[in-house]
Amino acid sequence: MKSQASKVNRGFAIATGTAIALCALAVSPGAEEQASLQLAAAVQTECDRLAGSPYDQQRNSEFAPVGIDDIDDSAVNACQMAYDATGNPRFAYQLGRALNKIQQPDHAMSAYNAAVQAGYPAAKVNFGMLMGRLGDEQAEFQLYQEAALSGNVLGAYNLGVAYRDGLGTKPDVSKALQWFEKAAAEGDDTAAFNIGTIYDEGQLVPQDDQMAIAWYDLAAQRGNTDAMVNLGLMYETGEGIAADAKKAAEMYRQAGENGDLFGAYKFLQMQELGIVPAPSDPSMPEGVNSLVLKPGDVETPTTVGKEI
């Protein structure tokens, strides 16, 4: 089975270029104040558009959330100017995300800390992660706990990981499950997958295949490829459920179509065994075929969590 997911991994040089003409606003005599207000509004809009997090319940919902890997470098300028103009902790947090993206963790910490001092929950999650990287697990735990108690989904997820793994606190599987369940109730697929692995592996609680299947199924429905693979393995071996090779193949197919190489390999293996039709699936990841993938070539991956 795929192993349990780890905690969430969550930067300061001002970029010289920007996607908006921040300095191109024409200012007529006597209109400096109006121009300043226009500029402030423009940079706030750009910061929200370029760097709003999918895990921040306080983000500007007028714009689609942006994953940390997709943040444009110009967000650094926009968010710095937006924060300087308003002092709004949301812009400090989004500045931290933009700085994280360009690999400036020290300056990202300064931006996150400004938001943390203002009580911004999402910033506490990212600042906690960075404190953990510096070796201060107690501060990491405290920040996750504060974020979780404020209702932040990723804070709840990371707090579950902390209780499961004993990060900054004593391991407590009951509390780990409690916080994973809170995150899962808000739609977090990795939290649901983690609950499934806890019951599947039976190391922290009595092993329970039915509970594992139920939580894997929920995670798979939400698009978690690790859960798809684990369900496929359970169907293939008849672990806790009637063996069904075709259902196993279907779970592997779905995982492969969503980019999971192990799932793709298992589906191709099923094709070679004649369990499903042999023609190659054009939706499989590029380069994945039975001629290049052999048993042992693909290591079962571990979900590493999400950037916010």
Predicted regions and their residues:
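N-terminal secretory signal peptides that target proteins for export/translocation
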Residues: 1-9
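Bacterial N-terminal signal peptides
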Residues: 15-24
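N-terminal leader/linker segments that initiate helical-solenoid repeat arrays
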Residues: 29-84, 293, 300, 305
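Short helix-capping/linker turns of helical repeat alpha-solenoids
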Residues: 43, 85-88, 118-121, 135, ...
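Terminal, low-structured helical/coil segments at or just beyond the last alpha-helical repeat
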Residues: 44-46, 256-308
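Structural signature of tandem alpha-helical TPR/SEL1-like repeats
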Residues: 69-77, 102-114, 133-146, 170-179, ...
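Canonical positions in the second alpha-helix
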Residues: 81-82, 114-115, 146-147, 182-183, ...
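Hydrophobic face of amphipathic alpha-helices that form TPR/SEL1-like repeat modules
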Residues: 94-101, 124-134, 156-165, 192-201, ...
